[in-house]
UniProtKB/Swiss-Prot annotation:
Record flagged with keyword Glycoprotein: no
Matches recorded under InterPro entries: Herpes_U30 (IPR007611), HSV_ITP (IPR034738)
Location in or out of the cell: Virion tegument; Host cytoplasm; Host nucleus; Host Golgi apparatus, Host trans-Golgi network
Name of the protein: Inner tegument protein
One Gene Ontology term, aspect cellular component: viral tegument
Positions of transmembrane segments: none
Subunit organization: Interacts (via C-terminus) with the large tegument protein/LTP (via N-terminus).
Keywords recorded for this protein, A-Z: Host cytoplasm, Host Golgi apparatus, Host nucleus, Virion, Virion tegument
GO BP of this protein: virion assembly
Origin superkingdom: Viruses
Record's keyword annotation contains DNA-binding: no
Organism: Human herpesvirus 6B (strain Z29) (HHV-6 variant B)
Main function: Plays an essential role in cytoplasmic secondary envelopment during viral egress. Interacts with the capsid via the large tegument protein/LTP and participates in its transport to the host trans-Golgi network (TGN) where secondary envelopment occurs. Modulates tegumentation and capsid accumulation at the viral assembly complex.
Chain positions covered by the region annotation Interaction with large tegument protein: 604-1082
Length: 1082
């Protein structure tokens, strides 16, 4: 038995004797491909490192083992904030250069180009790609913002700082800090409050309001720093209760006087304690032992209990609304709503989402869902799950499962499949068992309700990754699309008018989403699936409709649950919601820029669902009895907290009695403002107060003081902004000198609060802060009638940090997963190609006495195996070849996904046109473009070499298919389906028509290269006596088995020397052969 070697590439190598028609050149291609892929793998890993700040040392160390003959000496030290490269031994760079590099990296600026000269000299050769300093900008400057705890002020520290400064302006600056940053509750004591009040001079600024409404002021400006907020609030109440008598009688603000505020605050504390006790009620256990005679009773009791709690919380919020903007009270309300949300989730049971039309599989999936995500209220499902499986008689469970592979979509339900086979809802997959997995193709819809498909993530994954749907299943997908459309219309679609947020409606929405299989955890899984999915132009329209509807539902639910986790009817949530929407918008739009219209629908719905605001009627009740100064202060305070104008409020600006400088000229005032700006004293602005009513003061102060300060601030990087004092100085100056510009002041305060309280920067926070900075610029332009543009360094540094965060959270996981999968696949394919090339070098001879095949290369015997094992190996190789043809398509998909991710980054960054002039941002864009180019080149190289592998493998596979077809002619199935006579006749025809081929001469030293691959291949096919892991499924016996074994089976014993058998006609002559075949030729 031989192979046709004449189609091999005409290439000479040192492994083979010179010959125009050489076999081993094909194998050499395998070696070349392996070496090329090792370089490709390294470049790919470097791309990953650039994108994700990964430890490049691993890439370098792996590279050492590759056939490049280069050993590099790099430091092993890597920190979270920068890459530590103290020396470059290959190029002779000294330690001082490394220190210089680290210093530059720490400062988040582009390091001195000279620092990288030597590094680039060897990295160019190593990377095998054109290198430049710019390409490493992203890699060496990417950093994350350190988490900073919120800075609450200590009242004792403020008092000590005022000992040497008793001017009204110093006290105004102190109150500004308190109102911006808040006081730590544990620092607020009766004695300190009295000491602070006693320092306030009468008839100055809003000091009289603080003196008269002391309890309200400190409750309004105090944050609960303890983890036990209720205890912290009780201690605060105890301290504030002692200063009741210190306020003057006959105060004007009826609802904010000390006695009234203390009374309401005490009522709030008692109500919260009562509600928290009720929220500890174990009503989720009501379904553990359902009443046999009335299965609906427990559900009714539970529903009534939920409605009772909702009504009490609603009443609590309404009754205490006048203090619901005091920071200490707001934090208590916020904490209560978090507790309520957690409580509601932990009372959700399987019975709540079970419906009469559910199929057997629906019920199993819902049991698993409820027990996985809400175990505390679903412990009873452990027994119910087992009983349900034991009592099932009408459904053949075997039809649910797939035994043919381990594709990605199958793995989404892997643990669930184990739970079914073990009949154990608590089972976990530890790799100890082999079992079939739940089907993910559309055939599973025969057992799964359309409205429950989101409980089956594997099915969703499968549909997303199809280009076409079989015609017989299009009706199923149409039903799914109709169901999605119904969900969008009934649960998601925005109403024509937005009512105030209703707790009852929000909890109903939680229930509806859980009913179809969506909670915050499953939404995150689906967001990840959708983020990694990339539709192609040739995708069938019905699948595109499915994808758009799915994205609409999943992203709406995802944003809803994030908002719900943070919800409370307070200004805290109102500001959180802005940030959440910007963060999620950035994620969706950067993944798919064409989804911007879809995002508007999602955000409109979320805004409508979580609609909270302040009304003018509330403000009138809030300020009842107050004078204009009171109302002005309270309005500005509310605006600073909420950040929006919900209703107009007009007030007059009182003239300060200190303002006595109308007679100075504009030039003199300009000089004074300039001197103040250039002063080293942070409080120098206080000297401008006497001039604040001069007709030209506002314009001059903005131009000479505010604009240069804003320019300086926006020219900082974000980490420098966090430690710089000038922004808070600017806020104090504007609060003192421009009291009527509350919008400008609000945005400055917001920027400052953001800079000190931010946990991390992402694309959402960048969008918000960009908006704030340009709103500051817009207000400056309106006041000065000029065109002012802020500097871009601050926004660019935030943007780069934001994209670092995006790359780490979304691109990095995808790359990590893809690299693992792709390179595992490539390595397997290379091994397969080497095996195929090795077999092509052999000559196969069959021994008809014992049906054994010996494989040789030249005169060297390589391996001997049974005919049965040989054919099984051939079949296995053909099967692997077909599987590789399918699986290798994922590499092209990976390329498309990654390049689109990078392209979307470039598109998104370029959309910030105001920042494009910034050099650092241009370097960032250039870097991503270069990375994208190198990714394309790398994938192109992979594609070219894979095609060469395929050509090589196709030669062998075609030969093996011919061999298998000869065997299949005489297979038991063929004989059973036709007749023995016709099979023998066809076999004879094939045998006669088969041609032999010329055997090429192979050099002796090639045998050692080929032999291991052939030996390994056929050793793995030897029968073994080891015990296989038993399938947990019971295999049903069938009666339609073939009544005889395959004629090539090893269990048939051939009779040797048949000519010696009695009365047996045997001869080797042509006549004898003709005698045997003639009756079959008709």
């Amino acid at each position: 038995m031989t192979h046709d070697n004449r189609q091999l590439l005409p290439q000479e190598t040192k492994l083979v004797t010179p010959n125009k028609d050489t076999l081993s050149s094909r194998y050499l291609h395998v070696l070349i491909i392996d070496n090329t892929l090792s370089t490709i793998e390294f470049v790919y890993m470097v791309v990953k490192a650039v994108l994700t700040q990964a430890d490049t040392l691993k890439a370098f160390e792996q590279r050492k083992n590759r056939p490049t003959n280069r050993i590099l000496g790099l430091s092993t030290s890597v920190s979270k904030r920068y890459i530590n490269i103290p020396k470059f031994s290959s190029s002779g760079a000294n330690n001082s250069q490394g220190v210089k590099t680290l210093a530059a990296i720490r400062k988040f600026s582009l390091p001195d180009k000279n620092c990288f000269r030597n590094f680039l000299s060897f990295s160019t050769t190593l990377f095998k790609v054109p290198a430049s300093i710019d390409i490493y900008f992203l890699f060496f400057t990417a950093s994350t913002v350190s988490t900073m705890a919120a800075r609450a002020l200590d009242l004792e520290f403020i008092l000590s700082s005022l000992k040497n400064s008793t001017s009204p302006e110093s006290l105004l600056a102190a109150t500004a800090k308190i109102e911006i940053l808040s006081l730590a509750a544990d620092s607020v004591t009766h004695n300190r409050v009295i000491a602070f009040i006693n320092r306030l001079p009468p008839k100055k600024y809003h000091f009289d309001l603080i003196r008269e409404y002391t309890v309200f002021y400190f409750l309004n400006s105090t944050t609960l720093t303890s983890e036990n907020k209720l205890l912290s609030a009780e201690l605060l109440h105890e301290e504030l209760s002692q200063i009741r008598s210190s306020s003057s009688p006959g105060t004007e603000l009826e609802n904010l006087n000390n006695a009234e505020v203390l009374y309401v605050f005490d009522r709030i504390l008692n109500s919260i304690k009562m509600l928290k006790n009720e929220l500890s009620s174990p009503i989720g256990k009501l379904r553990v032992q359902p009443a046999a005679n009335d299965p609906g009773t427990d559900k009714t009791i539970k529903y009534s209990k939920i409605q009772s709690i909702i009504q009490k919380v609603h009443s609590f919020t309404r009754e205490n609304s006048l203090l619901a903007n005091c920071r200490a009270v707001v934090e208590l309300i916020d904490d209560l709503y978090r507790k309520l949300y957690s409580w509601f989730l932990h009372i959700l049971t399987f019975e709540d989402i079970q419906f009469p039309g559910d199929t057997f599989l629906d019920r199993l999936l819902k049991m698993d869902y409820c027990f996985t995500y809400y175990p505390s209220s679903n412990r009873h499902l452990i027994d119910l799950f087992e009983k349900t499986l034991d009592n099932q008689t009408s459904t053949d469970i075997d039809k649910f499962f797939d035994t043919s592979g381990n594709s990605p979509e199958l793995l989404y339900q892997k643990t669930f499949s184990l739970k079914i086979f073990s009949k154990n809802l608590t089972a976990q997959d530890n790799g100890l068992y082999i079992y079939p997995l739940l089907k993910t193709d559309l055939s599973i819809l025969d057992f799964l309700g359309t409205e429950n498909i989101l409980f089956h993530r594997g099915l969703i994954y499968h549909i997303l990754h199809q280009k076409t749907i079989p015609q017989e299943r299009e009706n199923d997908l149409n039903k799914i699309n109709q169901f999605f459309a119904t969900v969008i219309q009934q649960v998601i679609e925005t109403r024509s008018s937005c009512l105030p947020a209703s707790l009852s409606r929000l909890l109903d929405t939680i229930f509806h989403f859980n009913r179809i299989g969506l909670n915050i955890e499953t939404c995150r899984i689906y967001v990840e699936i959708l983020s990694n999915h990339m539709a192609t132009p040739d995708t069938q329209p019905i699948i595109n409709t499915f994808t758009i509807n799915l994205i609409h539902i999943v992203f709406t639910a995802h944003v809803f649950f994030i908002c719900m986790e943070n919800f409370s009817p307070t200004f805290l949530f109102y500001n959180r919601k802005k940030l959440i929407l910007e963060q999620q918008r950035a994620i969706l739009i950067i993944e798919r820029n064409e989804y911007s219209t879809l995002w508007k629908q999602i955000s409109d719905h979320i805004d409508c669902l979580f609609n909270i605001s302040l009304s003018e009627s509330f403000f009138k009740e809030y300020t009842k009895g107050g004078n204009e100064e009171h109302k002005q202060f309270l309005y500005k305070n509310l605006f600073e907290k909420w950040g929006d104008v919900f209703f107009p409020f007009t007030y007059s600006v009182t003239t300060s009695k200190n303002s006595t400088a109308h007679h100075i000229t504009t030039l003199e005032l300009r000089a004074i403002c300039k001197e103040v700006y250039q002063s080293d004293s942070p409080e120098a602005y206080e000297s401008l107060l006497p001039y604040s009513t001069h007709p030209a003061f506002k314009t001059l102060f903005i131009k000479i003081y505010v604009i240069p300060m804003v320019t300086y601030i926006t020219n900082l990087t974000f980490d420098k902004l966090q430690s710089d004092y000038r922004l808070i100085t600017l806020i104090h100056a504007c609060k003192l000198l421009l009291p009527s510009q509350h919008l400008l002041l609000h945005y400055m305060v917001w920027l400052y609060a953001f800079s000190i309280n931010v946990d991390h920067i992402d694309l959402g926070t960048f969008t918000v802060i960009k908006s704030v900075i340009f709103k500051i610029a817009d207000h400056i332009n309106v006041m000065t009638h000029t065109i002012y543009s802020p500097e871009t360094n601050l926004l660019v540094s935030i943007l780069l940090n934001a994209y670092t965060d995006y790359l780490q959270k979304y691109v990095n996981p995808w790359i990590k997963q893809t690299i693992t999968a792709n390179f595992s696949l490539l390595q397997t394919y290379i091994t397969f190609t080497k095996q195929c090339a090795s077999i092509l070098a052999t000559k196969c001879n069959i021994n008809l006495d014992n049906l054994f095949i010996s494989m040789t290369i030249g005169t060297d015997k390589i391996v001997t195996t049974s005919f049965c094992s040989f054919i099984a190996t051939c079949r296995n190789l053909v099967r692997q070849h077909e599987e590789f043809k399918k699986s290798l398509k994922t590499i092209e998909t990976s390329k498309t996904t990654l390049t689109n991710m990078l392209l979307n980054i470039i598109t998104s960054v370029s959309s910030s046109k105001e920042l494009l002039t910034n050099e650092a941002l241009q370097k960032f864009i250039d870097t991503v473009q270069r990375i994208s180019q190198h990714v394309n080149e790398t994938y192109q190289l992979i594609s070219v070499n894979l095609e060469k592998c395929k050509i090589s493998n196709d030669i062998l596979i075609e030969s093996l298919k011919k061999t298998i077809s000869i065997v299949d002619v005489l297979s038991s199935d063929a004989i059973l389906n036709t007749s023995l006579t016709s099979r023998c006749l066809e076999a004879a025809t094939l045998a006669v028509s088969n041609n032999s081929f010329t055997i090429l001469e192979i050099k002796k030293d090639a045998v050692a290269v080929f032999k291991p691959f052939i030996t390994q291949l056929f050793e793995s096919m030897k029968p073994t006596t080891s015990l296989y892991k038993k399938l947990m499924a019971t295999q049903k016996l069938t009666t339609d088995r073939i009544p005889f074994l395959d004629i090539f089976d090893d269990r048939y014993n051939l009779v040797r020397h048949v000519e010696r058998q009695l009365n047996w006609y045997a001869a080797y002559a042509e006549a004898a052969q003709q005698d045997l075949i003639a009756p079959l030729t008709f």
